[in-house]
Amino acid sequence: VLYLIRYQGPQWFEPVTYFGNNTLKDVFDYEPVQKDWKPEYESLLMGVQACMWTEFCNKPEDVDYLVFPRLAALAEVAWTRPEKKDWASFLKGMDSFNEHLAAKGIAYARSMYNIQHTVKPEDGALNVTLECIRPDVEIYYTLNGSNPAMSSHRYDGPICVTKTQMVKAATFMNGKQMGEILDLRLTWNKATAKPLLGNKKNEMLLVNGLRGSLKYTDFEWCNWNQNDSISFTIDLQGREILNKFSIGYRFSPLEVLY
């Protein structure tokens, strides 16, 4: 089942909706014919469908934002054989389609141009990885708090951070800024980038210097369910004087997140 109700891009930029991501690329890659189907089942498929719920939509423009341009990717799923799909070619047509939507006054999402970040502690430093689902854009970033431009650092690999740092980045195409500015405020303290031992893979988020947003599926929250055992150890790698200890959390009716 395909839903257009989930976040269609990096969640830091998106209006609140249902948890989880379903980007333009995810919809493009969707295949309604399942691998475990018998061969004769494919001929019985009458078409494709995407579901749209409106609990988080307050006006028609909110619906347009969630539907377009992902509806174009769904159409590509419907009329193109899997082996004939070409993401790069689709994106070229997408630019013209977006111009058409703008001319019609349709409030379409530009999420395809926004940056998804990953901040991972490694060897006493933070490695900041920046990605965009569009391979035809360039990413430029700054470390001095100014907004990025074509004259800024061009991103060509993980950025190594070893102190409190503000990283700003955006995508560019043909000399024009395409996506929103990503603003990462990395805070360094005694625990930042230190080795952490625990029982969940994403517990490293506790020492990556970055606070989560209000959207708990933004890939910056470490979550435990009600009956989970919580145990982790941060190795400060030496004797330290601690004057203050703090931890942030949010409570969800179904999950407790720290």
Can you annotate each of these PLM segments?
Residues 1-139, 189-203:
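Substrate-binding groove of N-acetylhexosamine-processing glycoside hydrolases
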Residues 85, 91-233, 250-253:
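Short, compositionally stereotyped local motifs that mark structural "simplifiers"
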Residues 231-242:
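Extracellular and analogous surface-interaction loops
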Residues 240-254:
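A short beta-strand element within beta-rich, extracytoplasmic domains
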Residues 257-258:
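Surface-exposed turn/loop modules enriched in turn-prone residues
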